[in-house]
Amino acid sequence: GAKKDLAQIAMAYGHVYVAQIAMGANPAQTIKAMKEAESYDGPSLIIAYAPCQAHGIKGGLANHQAEQKRAIDCGYFNLLRYDPRLEEQGKNPLQLDSNMQNN
């Protein structure tokens, strides 16, 4: 069957803090997402892109950070944060942290 988008499913509930991170691609976004998730008074879900040896990365796992960056840059995996508290303030709760401008 088709792959399900766990982040999208969790965001549909409306009361779950959701983040997609890739520490090797954007450490600052990772830290920000973890702090926000920890401070959220409700369920939080952090989905991390973490390549493994089975992915067949050229040069092995020594290149995992570059692989994470490539996955983000090409749009295979998006960095995002969904914070329901922002909606309470009249703001968009979904923040896309991936930079697709260079693609």
PLM feature spans:
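Glycine/aspartate-rich loop-and-adjacent alpha/beta segment that forms the canonical ThDP
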Residues: 30-103
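Conserved thiamine diphosphate
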Residues: 1-40
